[in-house]
C-alpha cells in the first residue's frame, strides 16, 4: 500500500492512502533525489520527518502512531511519502524485527504524485 503522512493545520500528523501507479512511483523526472538512507531502527519517541522523503519498508513490520490515537502498520513493499515537517510528528514502533527500510529524499518542489 502507499501512504502520505503530512502535518495538518491542527498541529498533528495525519495519514492518507495514496493510489500511485507504477509510473507515478518509478518515473518522476522532475524529482531529484537528495539522499539515500538505509535505516534498520526507527527514531525513538515523537518525531517529524527530517526532510521530504519516501520510506519503503524492505523487511519486518513497523507501526506509525499519530496524535489522534490512530495507527498504520507498514510491511514489506509499503511506500510512505513523508511530509510531516512540523507539529507533534508521529511515532514509529517496530512490530516485527528486524525492520529495514530505505529512505529516499526528494526535493521539496518535485512533483512525485499525479495531480
Named regions from a protein language model:
Residues 20-22, 67-85:
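Short acidic-glycine-tyrosine-enriched beta hairpin
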Residues 43-44, 61-65, 79, 109-110:
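Short beta-strand segments in beta-sandwich/barrel cores
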Residues 26, 72, 88-94:
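Short, Lys/Arg- and Gly-enriched loop/turn segments at beta-strand edges
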Residues 9, 58, 67:
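Short, ordered coil/turn segments that flank beta-strands lining enzyme active or ligand-binding pockets
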Residues 20-22, 30-49, 83-87, 110, ...:
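Conserved short histidine dyad/triad with adjacent acidic residue
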Residues 81-82, 96-111:
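A short hydrophobic beta-strand segment most commonly corresponding to one strand
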Residues 39, 48-64, 104-106:
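Short, conserved beta-strand element in jelly-roll/cupin
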Amino acid at each position: 500500500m502507499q501512504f502520505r503522512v503530512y502535518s495538518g493545520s491542527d498541529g498533528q500528523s495525519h495519514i492518507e492512502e495514496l493510489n500511485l501507479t507504477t509510473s507515478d512511483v518509478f518515473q518522476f523526472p522532475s524529482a531529484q533525489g537528495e539522499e539515500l538512507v538505509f535505516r534498520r531502527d526507527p527514531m525513538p519517541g515523537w518525531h517529524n520527518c527530517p526532510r521530504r522523503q519516501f520510506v519503503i519498508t524492505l523487511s519486518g513490520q513497523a507501526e506509525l502512531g499519530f496524535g489522534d490515537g490512530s495507527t498504520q502498520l507498514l510491511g514489506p513493499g509499503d511506500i510512505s511519502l513523508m511530509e510531516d515537517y512540523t507539529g507533534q510528528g508521529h511515532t514509529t514502533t517496530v512490530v516485527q524485527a528486524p525492520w529495514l527500510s530505505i529512505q529516499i529524499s526528494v526535493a521539496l518542489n518535485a512533483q512525485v504524485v499525479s495531480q
